[in-house]
């Protein structure tokens, strides 16, 4: 399983996401996540929600750079 598929599966398992896109390689990952759990939550807290299940991969240096974009379902529809 590729790192992008691993991340996608992990995030889907840990967070109730409506949409999840993960692209990139072992060093640079781009994540777009959509969920109603992001309603009324600031950007920092949204990123913390995504980072939490990824911490083991960051600590062991499997992941180096991560770009995260998060949206509530309404924000995604308006995008």
From Swiss-Prot:
Organism of origin is Buchnera aphidicola subsp. Baizongia pistaciae (strain Bp)
List the residue ranges forming a coiled coil, or say none: none
Name of the protein in question: Uncharacterized protein bbp_348
Task: Give the family this protein belongs to, as stated in its UniProt record.
Answer: Belongs to the BolA/IbaG family.
Alphabetical list of Pfam families matching this protein: BolA
Which Gene3D superfamilies does this chain map to? Answer: BolA-like (3.30.300.90)
Entry superkingdom: Bacteria
List the taxonomic lineage: Bacteria, Pseudomonadati, Pseudomonadota, Gammaproteobacteria, Enterobacterales
Q: Which SUPFAM superfamilies match?
A: BolA-like (SSF82657)
């Amino acid at each position: 399983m590729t790192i992008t598929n691993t991340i996608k599966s992990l995030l889907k398992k840990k967070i109730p996401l409506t949409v999840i896109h993960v692209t990139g390689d072992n060093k640079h990952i781009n994540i777009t996540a959509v969920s109603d759990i992001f309603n009324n939550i600031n950007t920092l807290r949204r990123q913390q929600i995504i980072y939490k299940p990824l911490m083991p991969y960051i600590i062991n240096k499997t992941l180096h750079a991560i770009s995260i974009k998060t949206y509530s379902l309404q924000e995604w529809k308006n995008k």
